[in-house]
Amino acid sequence: MIILIPVLVLIFLKINRHYVALGNALRLTPEDHFESTNTAVLVLTPSLHRGVLPALEFAKGLSSNVRAVHIDTDPLDVNLLIERWDTWGGGLPLVILESPYRSLVDPLLAYIKEVRKERENQLVVVVIPEFVAPKWWHRLLHNQSGLALKFVLLFQPGVITANVRYHLPKIA
């Protein structure tokens, strides 16, 4: 008990210092000002399906600088996507990123870095279309890549993620 009280006091002091430092880091100064930027919006497009269309509409409402991004892990999928894009792509540009090792993260991070260089302090919103299956065990089978990408993008400065969910009707 004699040791516990001083240890608790030290822990509480550390926590207090953390909150004071956090408050100082977030405090506005006269030099701070709101600067409107043209946000770039990237809609991840693994394929063209009903879950992607609401994501494209959402992205168009955020900015005039919208691009659909497909990471090429299978050339057959790319050809089908390109064929269907003119009909269903809503006039948005489609950017295809090569991924020789079937990695989603590395090509996307490299492209985000390129986009951020286009304008100083440009924010990038990455829209991740997801479909929500009606049964819990179906959810275990889908959207795992989206979860991994959201986790990686969480630690990228100037990058915001947005999920657009499409709720599937009951399926077998």
List the predicted regions and their residue ranges.
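Cytosolic C-terminal regulatory domains/tails of membrane transporters and channels
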Residues: I3-V7, I15-A172
